[in-house]
């Protein structure tokens, strides 16, 4: 599975992982493909728990437009885009 975000202690990370939604088939495939193709760089991809958190934040604020800067392989972009309304925009 993904490497944890280094700024979190084990207790916070364990809780965040336990309460977040696991990645679906598309995101799981993206994780595997990123690991395979990028090897040492795969740690740049956000974790599934972080993706769930980004989805939640996007929904909670009612975002209609989002700007994604610094995209790696698109995991966070997918999480944000899924949280936008049908007429929402991801730039």
Which residue ranges define each predicted feature?
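A short alpha-helical cap/connector motif
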Residues: 1-91
């Amino acid at each position: 599975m993904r490497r944890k975000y280094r700024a979190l202690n084990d207790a916070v990370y364990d809780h965040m992982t336990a309460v977040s939604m696991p990645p679906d088939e598309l995101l799981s495939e993206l994780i595997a493909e990123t690991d395979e193709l990028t090897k040492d760089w795969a740690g740049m991809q956000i974790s599934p728990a972080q993706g769930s958190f980004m989805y939640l934040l996007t929904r909670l604020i009612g975002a209609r437009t989002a700007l994604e800067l610094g995209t790696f392989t698109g995991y966070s972009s997918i999480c944000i885009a899924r949280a936008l309304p049908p007429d929402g925009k991801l730039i």
